Amino acid sequence: MIERILILLLAFLPLCNSALAEEAEPNPWGVDEWTLQTSLYTWHFDPEDYHNNDQHLIGAEAYFNNGWLAGIAVFENSFFQDCQYIFVGKTWPIRQSDHWYFKLTGGLLNGYDEPYENKIPLNGLGIAPAIIPAIGYRYKMFFTEANLGGLAALTVTAGVRF
């Protein structure tokens, strides 16, 4: 019986917490907004006939109150292999613009398998560290970004913020 009462109290605890949130300082790791995005096109700097220029990327990002972000993206790499990128990052306005920004993310990239496992550095275990810089433009709830994939490609994405 006591266990059931504790379970009920725990179930209602989030409701009590939100009522007290007005008086407390905001949680710096609270999510401020979400984004969903997809790839529009990829341009390879050294193109080959076998390169995939349509990555079918689907990405989601959470932007926190403290300015940091975290996200995941799933896509096909340049060799038509399914990949995942899990990352954290940050954005900075360009010249105090409300629209233009620079974004830098870093995380783990999975999916570059044989025979292309050596196309990205440090991919010994099938998972490699990655750093992806981007330039973005946002207008109201919409945005577009140009993401630099190492020295190999530039991918243009578009998405929505909510």
Regions found by a protein language model. Give the residues of each.
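Transmembrane beta-barrel architecture of outer-membrane proteins
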Residues: 55, 83-85, 128-132, 153
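Outer-membrane beta-barrel translocator/channel fold
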Residues: 50-51, 103-130
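Short glycine/proline- and aromatic-enriched beta-strand/turn motifs that initiate or cap beta-hairpins
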Residues: 21-64, 73-74
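Outer-membrane beta-barrel proteins
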Residues: 22-28, 64-66, 89-96, 139-141, ...
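Outer-envelope beta-barrel architecture signal
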Residues: 30-34, 66-68, 82-84, 98-102, ...
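Transmembrane beta-strand segments that form the barrel wall of outer-membrane beta-barrel proteins
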Residues: 36-44, 68-77, 133-135, 139-151
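Residues on the lipid-exposed face of transmembrane beta-strands in outer-membrane beta-barrel proteins
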Residues: 38, 58-62, 86-92, 104, ...
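Cleavable N-terminal export/targeting peptides
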Residues: 1-29
